[in-house]
Amino acid sequence: MQKKNAKKYAGLRDEQFSLVEHYARQHGINSKFLLVFTWIYNNPEGITQEFICKRTYSSKQVIQSIVKNHMRKGWLYLETIPNDKRRKLIRMTELGRKEIASLVEPLNIYEAKAFSALTKEQQKAFLEATQIFTETFKELIESYRVDD
């Protein structure tokens, strides 16, 4: 039964990932860009490249490419951290905030509407179960090592 339920959940999660990818593609980007933009948007005071790499399991090169590309578009800029000149915060310009908001905010609204289809009790149970599942899944994935 557990294996069957795990497979069913994986299918539902995959459908959610595919829906987000579809949404991103409609805006001319992919879900990795959308994920990075979401982190930047939700941290308007600035966020480091290292933090985004850690939270999205992305390489520095991937994040750096996204940031540099969107610096050229005038969406992002880098700000030196006063007490650590080597590290920089990624911040949005006014144009960037407007453009990124047009990507992130509709998705936030859709997620909130989908969540509101659940009762308060279902929401609480869903959040608790998802938190336990995510923490356990993370531990298992992060402990996995490929033999060389």
What are these regions (language model features)?
Residues 121-148:
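C-terminal regulatory/oligomerization modules of transcriptional regulators
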Residues 69-128:
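Charged, amphipathic alpha-helical coiled-coil/dimerization segments
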Residues 18-62:
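N-terminal helix-turn-helix DNA-binding core of bacterial DNA-binding proteins
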Residues 16, 20, 74, 100-103, ...:
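Hydrophobic recognition helices of helix-based DNA-binding modules
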Residues 1-27:
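N-terminal leader segment of winged-helix/HTH proteins
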Residues 38-42, 104, 131:
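Short, locally clustered residues in the helix-turn-helix/winged-helix DNA-binding domain
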Residues 5, 12, 32-33, 48, ...:
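N-terminal positioning helix adjacent to the helix-turn-helix/winged-helix DNA-binding module
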